[in-house]
Curated annotation (Swiss-Prot):
Gene3D superfamilies recorded: 3.30.70.260, P-loop containing nucleotide triphosphate hydrolases
Protein name (Swiss-Prot/TrEMBL): Methionine import ATP-binding protein MetN
InterPro entries assigned to the protein according to its UniProt record, in alphabetical order: AAA+_ATPase, ABC_transporter-like_ATP-bd, ABC_transporter-like_CS, ACT-like_dom_sf, MetN_ABC, MetN_ABC_transporter-like, NIL_domain, P-loop_NTPase
Residue ranges of every copy of the ABC transporter domain listed in the record: 2-247
Topology class, membrane: Peripheral membrane protein
Amino acid sequence: MITTTGLTKVYRSRGREVTALDGVDLHVREGEVYGVIGQSGAGKSSLIRCVNLLERPTSGTVTVAGQDLTALAGRGPRAGKELRTARSHIGMVFQHFNLLSSRTVQDNVELPLEILGVSGRERGRKALELLDLVGLTDKAKAYPAQLSGGQKQRVGIARALAGDPKVLLSDEATSALDPETTRSILQLLRDLNRQLGLTVLLITHEMNVVKSICDSAALMEKGRIVESGTVSELLGTPGSELASALFPVTGDASGDDRTVVDVTFHGEAATQPVISQLSRTYNIDISILGAAIDTVGGLQVGRMRIELPGRYEDNVVPIGFLREQGLQIDVVDKSDQESVLVKEGAK
């Protein structure tokens, strides 16, 4: 549904050049919720603004619903009209609500339809339908100043859906909201994704957002995507930075003659008592140093850091047993004080 190829964006100011996007390749499948995560300055917002050509890429291509938007970004009037038509099928929700304070909630939702030349009666019908969809039917005649932050964002979402988009872009839509309101907005986005078949591309710096609703995710650093895939694929990738960030675990070995192992489990393996089976099978005492578990995409997933007695060479067979159960295993290198992962699972 969304594909970028070799996407580059260079900003020029006062003789200086800043590369915000450096050859970004991204593929978002139809009907999925895709999260792009990264620190401030990683290039996330530049990426999402290039997807609908609010920012014109320096080079590379952007394809949405099979249409090459970069090919429509010419300078002539015809190119501009075609690009506007293509953009009408892409909704966008911003961090700041950008509601017109002098208009009622219903009038704010009607604004895109008004610009498209839709008749007044049809605009009103559509706006009320969308307000019902986001749970704000009773606020149709209210003004933005009378709404909470979460309600304002719901109006922003309804407005973004006015043109019946196939794609919804969300740029840090929950970062200004409290945790409870954030959860309700994320649930709304997931519900809309399922009810309307929307493809959702969201930008965030919060791991909880990815855990809550994303089917796939990508990690951005310095204008590049350094890791991407479905959440389940990432959890099964040895040494995955995203998996470690989604489910962080800590804990150091109690002695030099101990082996510390990070165990990642998801799907059916997450419901099996594999640690107790390991202890009974090999008659060894196992210490649990830390654990993180949650439900992602309806599946129970998590990571656990355990300590086994003896050095690594003494634990090759027990570690092999864990792998046979379908678990991802990363052996933690004790020689590094920061517990750098040895990508043992890649062997």
